[in-house]
Every structure is written in structure tokens, then in C-alpha cells.
Amino acid sequence: MVDPLILGAVGAGLAVGIAGLGSGIGAGITGASGAGVVAEDPNKFGTAIVFQALPQTQGLYGFLVAILILFVFKTVSPWAMFAAGLAAGLAGLSAIGQGIAASAGLGAVAEDNSIFGKAMVFSVLPETQAIYGLLIAILLLVGVFKGNAGAETVAALGAGFAVGFAGLSGIGQGITAAGAIGATARDPDAMGKGLVLAVMPETFAIFGLLIAILIMLMIK
């Protein structure tokens, strides 16, 4: 039997490490755009900070899950802790897509302040994948798996993989959202169609979320 502390430590590391990787890249993409914007107009510094903060939330979710794992490792299934870290960490890579969208949003706002609200709407879309990962991680950590140890292991890993890998769709969603921001900046009436296109990639994240929940209900 694997020591629970080992799997808990690995799960915590995956949560904060992978999610932090995504947030670091996403924030870097937006920050690079922000540096150019501030060079042109120093008064846009506050706006640049707001947009750069958006892809950092995934890292915070990963940090939160890591802390939770370290607090509950004595009472939760060891593989559930590992899977929770996997779910939060992989889904946190959606920050890369959010950084791409936020970078485009910042560039659009630099040209026209009136588009700020619309740019924010598109920029936050890729974060939902990370929220799905956070949700499944919390459900795993509250002890939904009781009973057969072998079934617990397989189910926990299945749920973590489902929502985690499906959460990578946030990268594609961010790319689409960035294009939609550009289209909306040119033609405000294009926002509705742009939103439809931007939410399409999220369908697969929802599939992953649903399968993860069904797996947990099946084993429970």
C-alpha cells in the first residue's frame, strides 16, 4: 500500500506546480502585451495589471487545492488526493488560453476604452475550465469515495483525468476568444457571433466535468 503522505505530497505538488506553470505562461503573454501598451501610454498601467491578473487565478486555485490536500491527507483516499491535484493542475493550464485572450483584450482596450467590458467578457471565458477542475478536486477531497480500495483508485484517477485533460480546451477557447475580441473591436455587432464561436471549445470541458461527476456517482 502506498503511503498516503506520498500521494498527498505528489497531489499537492501537481496542483500548485502545473497550475502555476499555466498561470506563469498566461500572465507572461499578457504582461508582454501590457509592456508595449504602457510604453505607448503610461496611464494604461492599471488596465494592464487588471488583464494580467486574469490568468493568475488558475495558479491560486492550484495553491488552494494543494493546501486542502495537506490538511486532509489523513482522512481522504490517497489516490483521491493525487487525482485532485491532477484535476486542478491540468485544468489550470487553461490559463495559457486566458493569457492569449487577455493579451488581445488589452490591445483592443489600448485602442478604444469603450470596449473594456466586452474584452473582459471574452477574457474570462477560458477560466471556467479551471473552475471545473477546482470543483472536481474539492469533491474528491471531501471523501466521496468509500468502500472498495481498488475501485476508489480507478474512479479517482478517471475523474481527475476526465476533467483535467478536458480542461486543456481552455487553450483553444482562449485563441478563439482573442480572435473574437479583434472582430468585436472592428465591429461591435460581431460580439454575439463571437461569443458563440468562443464557447464552442468549452463543450468538451463540460463533457469532461459530466463524466467525472458520473464516475464519482457510480462508485459512491
Curated annotation (Swiss-Prot):
This is A-type ATP synthase subunit K. Keywords: ATP-binding, Cell membrane, Hydrogen ion transport, Hydrolase, Ion transport, Lipid-binding, Membrane, Nucleotide-binding, Transmembrane, Transmembrane helix, Transport. It holds the Pfam family ATP-synt_C. Optimum temperature is 80 degrees Celsius. It comes from Methanocaldococcus jannaschii (strain ATCC 43067 / DSM 2661 / JAL-1 / JCM 10045 / NBRC 100440) (Methanococcus jannaschii). The keyword Ribonucleoprotein does not apply. The A-type ATPase is composed of subunits A(3), B(3), C, D, E(1 or 2), F, H(2), I and K(x). Subunit K dimerizes and may form higher oligomers. Purified ATP synthase is 25.9 nm long. The hydrophilic A1 domain is 9.4 X 11.5 nm, the central stalk is 8.0 X 3.9 nm and the membrane-bound A0 domain is 6.4 X 10.6 nm; the domains are connected by two stalks. ATP is synthesized or hydrolyzed by the A1 domain while ion translocation occurs via the A0 domain. It is found in: Cell membrane. It comes from the Archaea.
